Amino acid sequence: MQLNIPTWLTLFRVVLIPFFVLAFYLPFVWAPMVCAIIFVFAAATDWFDGFLARRWKQTTRFGAFLDPVADKVMVAVALVLVAEHYHSWWITLPAATMIAREIIISSLREWMAEIGKRSSVAVSWVGKVKTMAQMGSLVGLLWRPDHNVELASFVLLYIAAVLTFWSMFQYLNAAWSDLLEP
Protein backbone atom coordinates (compact mmCIF):
# COMPACT_ATOMS: atom_id res chain seq x y z
CA MET A 1 0.00 0.00 0.00
CA GLN A 2 1.33 3.40 -0.99
CA LEU A 3 0.39 6.28 1.30
CA ASN A 4 -0.65 9.54 -0.31
CA ILE A 5 -0.58 13.06 1.14
CA PRO A 6 -4.20 13.02 2.39
CA THR A 7 -3.55 9.75 4.23
CA TRP A 8 -0.31 11.13 5.70
CA LEU A 9 -2.31 14.11 6.99
CA THR A 10 -4.77 11.74 8.65
CA LEU A 11 -1.92 9.75 10.21
CA PHE A 12 -0.37 13.02 11.38
CA ARG A 13 -3.64 13.85 13.14
CA VAL A 14 -3.41 10.55 15.03
CA VAL A 15 0.22 11.30 15.96
CA LEU A 16 -0.83 14.72 17.31
CA ILE A 17 -3.16 13.17 19.92
CA PRO A 18 -0.47 12.31 22.52
CA PHE A 19 1.07 15.77 22.10
CA PHE A 20 -2.34 17.32 22.58
CA VAL A 21 -2.80 15.32 25.81
CA LEU A 22 0.71 16.19 26.99
CA ALA A 23 0.11 19.90 26.36
CA PHE A 24 -3.13 19.68 28.37
CA TYR A 25 -1.24 18.47 31.45
CA LEU A 26 1.78 20.77 31.22
CA PRO A 27 2.04 22.94 34.36
CA PHE A 28 2.53 26.22 32.51
CA VAL A 29 0.29 29.24 31.98
CA TRP A 30 0.64 28.89 28.20
CA ALA A 31 -0.24 25.16 28.16
CA PRO A 32 -4.01 25.58 27.53
CA MET A 33 -3.31 27.80 24.52
CA VAL A 34 -0.81 25.28 23.09
CA CYS A 35 -3.29 22.46 23.70
CA ALA A 36 -6.00 24.40 21.85
CA ILE A 37 -3.64 25.24 18.98
CA ILE A 38 -2.72 21.57 18.54
CA PHE A 39 -6.43 20.70 18.58
CA VAL A 40 -7.22 23.40 15.98
CA PHE A 41 -4.36 22.18 13.80
CA ALA A 42 -5.58 18.59 14.06
CA ALA A 43 -9.15 19.67 13.26
CA ALA A 44 -7.88 21.62 10.24
CA THR A 45 -6.09 18.53 8.93
CA ASP A 46 -9.43 16.71 9.21
CA TRP A 47 -10.99 19.10 6.73
CA PHE A 48 -7.88 19.42 4.57
CA ASP A 49 -7.17 15.69 4.14
CA GLY A 50 -10.67 15.04 2.84
CA PHE A 51 -10.55 18.08 0.57
CA LEU A 52 -7.23 16.98 -0.94
CA ALA A 53 -8.29 13.35 -1.30
CA ARG A 54 -11.38 14.39 -3.28
CA ARG A 55 -9.68 17.11 -5.31
CA TRP A 56 -6.66 14.99 -6.25
CA LYS A 57 -8.80 11.85 -6.63
CA GLN A 58 -6.67 10.09 -4.02
CA THR A 59 -9.37 8.51 -1.90
CA THR A 60 -8.33 5.12 -0.57
CA ARG A 61 -9.97 2.43 1.50
CA PHE A 62 -7.38 2.92 4.22
CA GLY A 63 -7.98 6.68 4.26
CA ALA A 64 -11.76 6.17 4.30
CA PHE A 65 -11.32 3.90 7.33
CA LEU A 66 -8.69 5.93 9.19
CA ASP A 67 -10.19 9.42 8.76
CA PRO A 68 -13.35 8.89 10.84
CA VAL A 69 -11.38 6.87 13.41
CA ALA A 70 -8.86 9.70 13.81
CA ASP A 71 -11.70 12.22 14.12
CA LYS A 72 -13.57 10.24 16.74
CA VAL A 73 -10.48 9.53 18.84
CA MET A 74 -9.37 13.17 18.70
CA VAL A 75 -12.79 14.48 19.74
CA ALA A 76 -13.33 11.79 22.40
CA VAL A 77 -9.94 12.55 23.98
CA ALA A 78 -10.73 16.28 23.98
CA LEU A 79 -14.14 15.66 25.58
CA VAL A 80 -12.60 13.47 28.28
CA LEU A 81 -9.94 16.10 29.04
CA VAL A 82 -12.53 18.88 29.24
CA ALA A 83 -14.77 16.76 31.49
CA GLU A 84 -11.81 16.02 33.73
CA HIS A 85 -10.80 19.67 33.92
CA TYR A 86 -14.24 20.89 34.96
CA HIS A 87 -15.04 17.83 37.07
CA SER A 88 -18.75 18.61 36.95
CA TRP A 89 -21.80 16.64 35.86
CA TRP A 90 -23.03 19.48 33.65
CA ILE A 91 -19.90 19.16 31.49
CA THR A 92 -19.47 15.40 31.81
CA LEU A 93 -23.08 14.69 30.75
CA PRO A 94 -22.89 16.35 27.30
CA ALA A 95 -19.36 14.97 26.84
CA ALA A 96 -20.49 11.42 27.61
CA THR A 97 -23.54 11.88 25.36
CA MET A 98 -21.35 12.93 22.44
CA ILE A 99 -18.92 10.05 22.94
CA ALA A 100 -21.81 7.56 23.20
CA ARG A 101 -23.38 8.94 20.02
CA GLU A 102 -20.12 8.49 18.12
CA ILE A 103 -19.90 4.86 19.23
CA ILE A 104 -23.57 4.20 18.40
CA ILE A 105 -23.46 5.84 14.96
CA SER A 106 -20.12 4.26 14.04
CA SER A 107 -21.54 0.85 14.94
CA LEU A 108 -24.74 1.60 13.03
CA ARG A 109 -22.80 2.64 9.92
CA GLU A 110 -20.67 -0.49 10.08
CA TRP A 111 -23.75 -2.68 10.45
CA MET A 112 -25.60 -0.89 7.63
CA ALA A 113 -22.55 -1.35 5.38
CA GLU A 114 -22.58 -5.07 6.17
CA ILE A 115 -26.17 -5.36 4.98
CA GLY A 116 -25.46 -3.21 1.91
CA LYS A 117 -27.28 -0.07 3.02
CA ARG A 118 -24.42 2.26 4.00
CA SER A 119 -25.90 5.17 2.02
CA SER A 120 -28.99 5.11 4.28
CA VAL A 121 -26.87 6.56 7.08
CA ALA A 122 -24.77 9.07 5.15
CA VAL A 123 -23.49 12.19 6.92
CA SER A 124 -26.23 14.83 7.25
CA TRP A 125 -26.07 18.61 7.49
CA VAL A 126 -27.10 18.35 11.16
CA GLY A 127 -24.02 16.23 11.78
CA LYS A 128 -21.84 18.83 10.08
CA VAL A 129 -23.30 21.70 12.15
CA LYS A 130 -22.89 19.53 15.26
CA THR A 131 -19.24 19.04 14.41
CA MET A 132 -18.68 22.79 13.98
CA ALA A 133 -20.35 23.57 17.33
CA GLN A 134 -18.45 20.74 18.98
CA MET A 135 -15.07 21.88 17.62
CA GLY A 136 -15.75 25.49 18.57
CA SER A 137 -16.75 24.53 22.09
CA LEU A 138 -13.74 22.27 22.55
CA VAL A 139 -11.28 24.90 21.37
CA GLY A 140 -12.72 27.40 23.87
CA LEU A 141 -12.91 24.91 26.73
CA LEU A 142 -9.37 23.68 26.15
CA TRP A 143 -7.94 27.19 25.89
CA ARG A 144 -10.08 29.06 28.45
CA PRO A 145 -8.48 32.50 27.79
CA ASP A 146 -11.22 34.38 29.66
CA HIS A 147 -14.65 33.99 31.23
CA ASN A 148 -16.57 35.16 28.14
CA VAL A 149 -14.91 32.60 25.87
CA GLU A 150 -15.59 29.94 28.47
CA LEU A 151 -19.29 30.88 28.68
CA ALA A 152 -19.65 30.95 24.90
CA SER A 153 -17.95 27.54 24.78
CA PHE A 154 -20.39 26.12 27.35
CA VAL A 155 -23.28 27.34 25.17
CA LEU A 156 -21.68 25.77 22.08
CA LEU A 157 -21.14 22.52 24.00
CA TYR A 158 -24.85 22.33 24.80
CA ILE A 159 -25.81 23.25 21.24
CA ALA A 160 -23.53 20.43 20.08
CA ALA A 161 -25.16 18.07 22.61
CA VAL A 162 -28.66 18.89 21.33
CA LEU A 163 -27.50 18.46 17.72
CA THR A 164 -25.84 15.21 18.79
CA PHE A 165 -29.21 13.82 19.88
CA TRP A 166 -30.95 15.20 16.82
CA SER A 167 -28.47 13.70 14.36
CA MET A 168 -28.38 10.40 16.25
CA PHE A 169 -32.16 10.11 16.02
CA GLN A 170 -32.00 10.98 12.31
CA TYR A 171 -29.53 8.16 11.72
CA LEU A 172 -31.51 5.70 13.84
CA ASN A 173 -34.74 6.70 12.09
CA ALA A 174 -33.13 6.14 8.68
CA ALA A 175 -32.08 2.64 9.76
CA TRP A 176 -35.13 1.80 11.89
CA SER A 177 -36.90 -0.54 9.48
CA ASP A 178 -33.66 -2.47 8.92
CA LEU A 179 -33.02 -2.64 12.66
CA LEU A 180 -36.45 -4.16 13.29
CA GLU A 181 -36.19 -6.86 10.63
CA PRO A 182 -35.97 -10.37 12.08
From Swiss-Prot:
UniProt main location, coarse: membrane
Its membrane topology is listed as: Multi-pass membrane protein
Q: Which residues lie on this side of the membrane: Cytoplasmic?
A: 1-12, 82-86, 169-181
The protein's enzyme class: transferase
Keywords (A to Z) from UniProt = Cell inner membrane, Cell membrane, Lipid biosynthesis, Lipid metabolism, Membrane, Phospholipid biosynthesis, Phospholipid metabolism, Transferase, Transmembrane, Transmembrane helix
What pathway does the UniProt record associate with this protein?
Phospholipid metabolism; phosphatidylglycerol biosynthesis; phosphatidylglycerol from CDP-diacylglycerol: step 1/2
The record's annotation in PANTHER family points to: CDP-DIACYLGLYCEROL--GLYCEROL-3-PHOSPHATE 3-PHOSPHATIDYLTRANSFERASE 1, CHLOROPLASTIC (PTHR14269:SF62), CDP-DIACYLGLYCEROL--GLYCEROL-3-PHOSPHATE 3-PHOSPHATIDYLTRANSFERASE-RELATED (PTHR14269)
The segments annotated as topological domain Periplasmic are: 38-60, 108-145
Catalytic reaction annotation: a CDP-1,2-diacyl-sn-glycerol + sn-glycerol 3-phosphate = a 1,2-diacyl-sn-glycero-3-phospho-(1'-sn-glycero-3'-phosphate) + CMP + H(+)
Q: Which InterPro entries match?
A: CDP-alcohol_PTase-I (IPR050324), CDP-OH_P_trans (IPR000462), CDP-OH_PTrfase_TM_dom (IPR043130), CDP_ALCOHOL_P_TRANSF_CS (IPR048254), PGP_synthase_bac (IPR023762), Phosphatidylglycerol_P_synth (IPR004570)
Q: Which GO terms describe its cellular component?
A: plasma membrane
What family is this protein classified in? Belongs to the CDP-alcohol phosphatidyltransferase class-I family.
Tell me a GO biological process for this protein: glycerophospholipid biosynthetic process
- Please indicate which superkingdom the organism of origin belongs to: Bacteria
- So what EC number does this one have? 2.7.8.5
User: Which Cys pairs are S-S linked?
Assistant: none
Q: Which named protein is this?
A: CDP-diacylglycerol--glycerol-3-phosphate 3-phosphatidyltransferase
Transmembrane stretches in the record are 13-37, 61-81, 87-107, 146-168
Does the record bear Lipid biosynthesis in its keywords? yes
The protein's job, in short, is: Catalyzes the conversion of cytidine diphosphate diacylglycerol (CDP-DG) and glycerol 3-phosphate into phosphatidylglycerol. Essential for the synthesis of anionic phospholipids, thereby playing a role in balancing the ratio of zwitterionic and anionic phospholipids, which is thought to be important for normal membrane function.
Location within or outside the cell: Cell inner membrane
